[in-house]
């Protein structure tokens, strides 16, 4: 993924000499990322889009390693796109440099884009009358409301590519989970997880 990321991130880091640089990277399961990317680019099919690349070989860890090597003084924060609804406030706090318990405005604006209008209203009303005591409780409530009120068109990804079957998608997902584990162990990388 992103073969010139090392050069481009290094150039970005040089824009403000002496400034502390941080990079934030959302990763996504290649089994859902590729179909979405192909739909956006109107690619003819996976064989044209991927060429000789084996879909099982697609990993995010080399990208993160390249960014770290090109910018050894910079920290890199990574999260899985699939987890975004549960960890959105943490992402915002990390990106803005706020302390972990800082209450930010608009932390549920993202959820409004993936939930029904009735669902987001109910969730906000619930949080108003039952403020969560910690992040774990907040995540459980968000997960419960998403289970009931998610806008399926916004969160479901249809994987319908020629030559891709359930076994391939499952194998890609397992490889992605192993890749996440490798990223989590990298020095200078903060992986935000639920």
Where would I find each of the regions flagged by the language model?
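Anion-recognition interface
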Residues: 1-194
């Amino acid at each position: 993924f992103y073969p010139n990321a090392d050069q481009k991130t290094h150039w970005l880091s040089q824009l403000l000499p002496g400034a502390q640089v941080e990079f934030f990277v959302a990763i996504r399961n290649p089994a859902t990322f590729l179909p979405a990317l192909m739909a956006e680019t109107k690619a003819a099919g996976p064989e044209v889009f991927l060429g000789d690349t084996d879909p099982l070989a697609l990993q995010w860890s080399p990208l993160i390693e390249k960014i770290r090597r090109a910018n050894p003084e910079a920290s890199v924060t990574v999260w899985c796109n699939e987890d975004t609804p549960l960890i959105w406030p943490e992402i915002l706090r990390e990106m803005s440099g706020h302390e972990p318990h800082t209450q930010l405005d608009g932390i549920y604006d993202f959820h409004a884009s993936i939930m029904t209008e009735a669902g987001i209203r109910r969730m906000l009303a619930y949080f108003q009358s039952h403020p969560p005591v910690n992040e774990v409780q907040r995540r459980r409530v968000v997960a419960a409301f998403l289970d009931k009120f998610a806008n399926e068109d916004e969160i479901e990804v249809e994987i319908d590519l020629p030559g891709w079957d359930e076994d391939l998608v499952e194998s890609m997902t397992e490889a992605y989970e192993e890749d996440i584990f490798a990223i989590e162990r990298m020095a200078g990388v903060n992986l935000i997880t639920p």
